[in-house]
């Protein structure tokens, strides 16, 4: 298992990529970069980027490439990411994939892509049952019975874009934009697909088996 490598975790909204990315980051001792969390932090702080991004996210649309890449690249350039990191929520478009590939090649870094496969029906069920900590961005399932975050004790909330109409838009948008990304990484020999409808622990073990090959 390599540590000095970048792992890109892909999958539709609600596929568990945030949870799996965090688990992998803890296992390998690498930073976890979530473009979604970075954008939400910018929105919460009302930065110029955050204000622009919120208009797209609230409508279930993808944030334009330039806005997302600016904040992701800034984070990747930090010293703690020099030995590798776990990236989730990025790239979502072919343009973003090329930008990230060129950045990593220039940095003489290797990377692998893990695609989490989940059916639409399961995605909708998962998203309807999830709650978010607005402070530390951890995701919890309704079945866990938490009303506040066990870590920071903030009240758990639903995301404003976790409605059926917006979820369906996001799924359709994801499929339309990421098909070319998946093909791009497959052609480069970087892609591994992992079935992700089992329990989080079982999915994580499947991911570990893939990266240990």
Swiss-Prot record:
Binding of AMP: at which residues? 35, 40, 61-63, 89-92, 96, 159, 170
Keyword Signal among record annotations: no
SUPFAM superfamilies given for it? Answer: P-loop containing nucleoside triphosphate hydrolases, Rubredoxin-like
GO cellular component labels: cytoplasm
Query: Which residue ranges run through the membrane?
Result: none
Q: Where is this region: LID?
A: 129-162
UniProt keywords (A-Z) are: ATP-binding, Cytoplasm, Kinase, Metal-binding, Nucleotide biosynthesis, Nucleotide-binding, Transferase, Zinc
| Pathway membership, UniProt | Purine metabolism; AMP biosynthesis via salvage pathway; AMP from ADP: step 1/1
Its Enzyme Commission number(s) read 2.7.4.3
List positions binding ATP: 14-19, 130, 139-140, 198
Keyword Kinase on this protein?
A: yes
Catalysed reaction(s) here are: AMP + ATP = 2 ADP
Q: Which family does it belong to?
A: Belongs to the adenylate kinase family.
What does it do? Catalyzes the reversible transfer of the terminal phosphate group between ATP and AMP. Plays an important role in cellular energy homeostasis and in adenine nucleotide metabolism.
Q: What quaternary arrangement does the UniProt entry report?
A: Monomer.
The protein's name in its UniProt record: Adenylate kinase
- Species of the source: Chlamydia felis (strain Fe/C-56)
């Amino acid at each position: 298992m390599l540590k000095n490598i970048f792992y890109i975790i892909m999958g539709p909204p609600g596929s568990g990529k945030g949870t799996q990315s965090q688990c992998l980051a803890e296992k390998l001792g690498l930073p976890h970069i979530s473009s979604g969390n970075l954008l939400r932090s910018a929105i919460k702080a009302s930065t110029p980027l955050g204000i622009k991004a919120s208009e797209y996210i609230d409508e279930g649309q993808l944030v334009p490439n330039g806005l997302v890449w600016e904040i992701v690249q800034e984070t990747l350039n930090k010293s703690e990411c020099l030995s590798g990191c776990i990236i989730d929520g990025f790239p979502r478009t072919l343009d973003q994939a090329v930008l990230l590939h060129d950045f990593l090649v220039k940095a003489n870094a290797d990377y692998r892509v893990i695609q989490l496969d989940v059916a639409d029906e399961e995605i909708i069920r998962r998203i309807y049952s999830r709650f978010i900590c607005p402070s530390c961005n951890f995701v919890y399932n309704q079945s866990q019975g938490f009303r506040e975050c066990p870590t920071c004790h903030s009240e758990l909330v639903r995301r404003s874009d976790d409605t059926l109409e917006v979820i369906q838009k996001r799924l359709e948008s994801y499929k339309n934009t990421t098909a070319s990304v998946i093909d791009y990484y497959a052609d480069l020999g970087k892609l591994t697909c992992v079935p992700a409808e089992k329990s989080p622990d079982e999915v994580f073990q499947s991911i570990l088996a893939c990266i240990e090959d």
